[in-house]
């Protein structure tokens, strides 16, 4: 009988501990972090592969070659974009962890309204700092989303030309890379529907795959923007709650101080009356 009671108390204690741990998880920050990681993974992974596919398409079907020396050509720009993608993946992996840690600490400060005042003050300052940083990152991701839409538009035009040549017999359509700024005005890198390279490019799966990879990368950038907006809402709410916690703590300190002063005054008066009677 006693063993059953001890076992029940142990199970109850474990259940209460699990409930307490689950209650301390910042679910809003967790959802935003998952969305951020998913968006960054889609953008970085698909964007990297789409850039590699673009290099193959330019070299195979447009017959472009890398410029010797330190000349800044389209292939050098693509390599730079790949390094930027590596940096974005690493930076936002760390930033997501920092925001989750901030969410845990701020949630603990909010739940303990009567805790140490230094904890809530630190949480308030950290929340304000992350709000500013997240807002800047949101603007940056908006720019990345707008920039990613450019290759999607270019590949959509190319895909449309391929589709129109199959629907309209005898159509002679051309695509000049100079109109997209990929090559200089002096270079003529034009491919027309009557050429063999164009037909092979339209029949290959590489064009279709690269086009859809850029679309998924654009969707990933949009998901990162949504995650940044979600983080802004979470951080703003946490900052407001921590600010209220600070005010509550100040009020409690002033209230306890006044009560102590009143108690001291009453004690002093009681002693004076007692001395007067004696």
Curated annotation (Swiss-Prot):
The modification Phosphothreonine is found at residue 278. PROSITE patterns: MYELIN_PLP_1, MYELIN_PLP_2. The modification N-acetylmethionine is found at residue 1. One of its GO terms (cellular component) is axonal growth cone. Keywords: Acetylation, Cell membrane, Cell projection, Disulfide bond, Glycoprotein, Lipoprotein, Membrane, Neurogenesis, Palmitate, Phosphoprotein, Synapse, Transmembrane, Transmembrane helix. Residues 44-84, 149-213 are extracellular. Its main location: membrane. GO terms for molecular function: calcium channel activity. Residues 1-22, 106-127, 235-278 are cytoplasmic. It is a multi-pass membrane protein. The chain crosses the membrane at residues 23-43, 85-105, 128-148, 214-234. N-glycosylated. Palmitoylated by ZDHHC17/HIP14. The modification Phosphoserine is found at residue 256. It comes from the Eukaryota. Disulfide bonds join 174-192. The keyword Transmembrane helix applies. Belongs to the myelin proteolipid protein family. Involved in neuronal differentiation, including differentiation and migration of neuronal stem cells. Plays a role in neuronal plasticity and is involved in neurite and filopodia outgrowth, filopodia motility and probably synapse formation. GPM6A-induced filopodia formation involves mitogen-activated protein kinase (MAPK) and Src signaling pathways. May be involved in neuronal NGF-dependent Ca(2+) influx. May be involved in regulation of endocytosis and intracellular trafficking of G-protein-coupled receptors (GPCRs); enhances internalization and recycling of mu-type opioid receptor. This is Neuronal membrane glycoprotein M6-a.
């Amino acid at each position: 009988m006693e063993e059953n009671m001890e076992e029940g108390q142990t199970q109850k204690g474990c259940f209460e501990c699990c409930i307490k741990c689950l209650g301390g998880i910042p679910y809003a920050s967790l959802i935003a972090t998952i969305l951020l990681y998913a968006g960054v993974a889609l953008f970085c992974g698909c964007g990297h592969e789409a850039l590699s596919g673009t290099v193959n398409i330019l070299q195979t079907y447009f017959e472009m070659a890398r410029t010797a020396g330190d000349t800044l050509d389209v292939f050098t720009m693509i390599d730079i974009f790949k390094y930027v993608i590596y940096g974005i993946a690493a930076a936002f992996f760390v930033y997501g962890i920092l925001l989750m840690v901030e969410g845990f600490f701020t949630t603990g400060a909010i739940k303990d309204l009567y805790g140490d005042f230094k904890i809530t003050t630190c949480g308030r300052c950290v929340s304000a700092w992350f709000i500013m940083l997240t807002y800047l990152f949101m603007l940056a991701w908006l720019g990345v989303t707008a920039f990613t839409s450019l290759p999607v538009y270019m590949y959509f035009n190319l895909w449309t030309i391929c589709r129109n040549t199959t629907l309209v017999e005898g159509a002679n359509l051309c695509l000049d890379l100079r109109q997209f700024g990929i090559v200089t005005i002096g270079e003529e890198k034009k491919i027309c529907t009557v050429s063999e390279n164009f037909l092979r490019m339209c029949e290959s799966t590489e064009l279709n795959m690269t086009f859809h990879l850029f679309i998924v990368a654009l969707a990933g950038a949009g998901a990162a923007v949504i995650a940044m907006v979600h983080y802004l809402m979470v951080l703003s709410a946490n900052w407001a709650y921590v600010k209220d916690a600070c005010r509550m703590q100040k009020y409690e300190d002033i209230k306890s101080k006044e009560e102590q002063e009143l108690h001291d005054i009453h004690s002093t008066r009681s002693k004076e009356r007692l001395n007067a009677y004696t």
